[in-house]
Amino acid sequence: MRALIDLQKKLYPDLLHTMQQRYTILNSVNMFQPIGRRGLAEHLSLTERVVRAEVDLLHDQGLIDVTTKGMLITEEGKVVVEQMAAFMKEMMGLTVLEEQLKDTLHVGKAIVVPGNSDNENWVKLEMGKACVSFLKSTIMKNQTVAVTGGTTMAAVAHAMVPFTASNQCLFVPARGGIGEKVENQANTIAAEMARKANGDYRLLYVPDPLSETSYQTMLNEPAINEILQLIRGSDVVLHGIGDALTMAKRRKTANEIIQQLVAKDAVSEAFGYYFNKAGDVVHKVRTIGIQLEDLHEAKSVIAVAGGRSKALAITSYFQQGKSDLFITDEAAAEQILRGRSL
C-alpha cells in the first residue's frame, strides 16, 4: 500500500489532499455531532466557504444529514470513516511513526493520531477514541480498570462506548485527587467511564497530596484500605503523562517544592512521581493509590498523552515507565523522534 500511496502523491497530489480533507470533515462530524458549519470550520481551521462546499458534496453522497440542530453522520458515513481509517493513517505516514515510536520508547505498541492536541481539541478526542477502541477489543469480564485524572483521561471518558464484556468490569480511580476541577478528577472520570461502558465503579474520597500523618491515618481506615487494594491490584491501568511544573502548579504545590523541582530539572509527572530528563525520580507526592511498582503487576498499562509541548515529558517518563500501549498524536510523535535524533 505504501508504494501505491507514494505513486499517487506524485501523480495526483491534489486528489489525496482533497480525500484527506473530506475524511477529516466527515470524521469530525462523527465526533462532534450535531454540529453547525461555523463550529466545524472553527474546529478544523477552515473557511466556512470551504466547509460549505465539502458538506454539500458529502450530503449529496448520503454520508451526512443536515438538520436544524446541525450536521449528523449517516450509517453509511460511519462505514466510510471506519473503512478509510487505515488507509488515511498509511497515507499520512502515521504507521511509520508508530513503528519508530515503538522502537524509540520501547513500548509494546504505539498508536498515533493526526494533529496536535496542544491547539486542536478534536485531536484529544481522537486519542480517546483510539484508547476506547483498544480497550473494547482487549478487555475481559471481571477485570478492574484504574484511571488517573486529567484532561486527556477526561477525553477518553467522553469517547467511551458500551463494552461487550464490561457489564462485570469495575472502574476505579488510580489515586486520590479531591481538590482539582471536578471534571478532571479521577473519581469523576472513572464513574463516567463505568456509566457509558455499562460497568460498575468504586470511588476514593481522599485529597491529593497528603501529609505523612494524614496518609498513615487514612491507611488505617478499613473502607479506604479496601478500595486501595482494588486499585493497586487493577488489571488495566489508564494514565496520562504531565509536564512537571504544569502539574505541580495545577495541584497548588507550595512554591518551595516548585523551586526544588526546577533545581532538580523535573520535566514529567505521572502517579505523583516527578522525573528528570534521564527518567530518574526527583520528587514524589505522598498519595493514596497506584505506585510505580504496581504497574509491573498489571496485565495492561495504557499511557495516553499528546501535544508537541509534551514531547520532552513523554520521553522522560518512558526512560523507566512501563507501558504496553502508548497513544499520542502526530505532533508529539514527530517531536519525540526529532529529539532522539539530535
Task: Annotate the PLM regions.
Residues 59-141, 158, 163-166, 182:
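HTH-adjacent hinge/linker in prokaryotic transcriptional regulators
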Residues 47-48, 146-155, 179, 243-245, ...:
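Gly/Ser/Thr-rich loops at beta-strand to alpha-helix junctions
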Residues 1-87:
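Basic, Lys/Arg-rich alpha-helical nucleic-acid-recognition elements, primarily the DNA-binding modules
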Residues 10-16, 76-80, 98, 285-342:
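ATP/nucleoside-binding phosphotransfer catalytic cores, i.e., glycine-rich phosphate-binding loops
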Residues 99-109, 167-243, 253:
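Ligand-binding beta-strand-loop-alpha-helix segment within the catalytic cores
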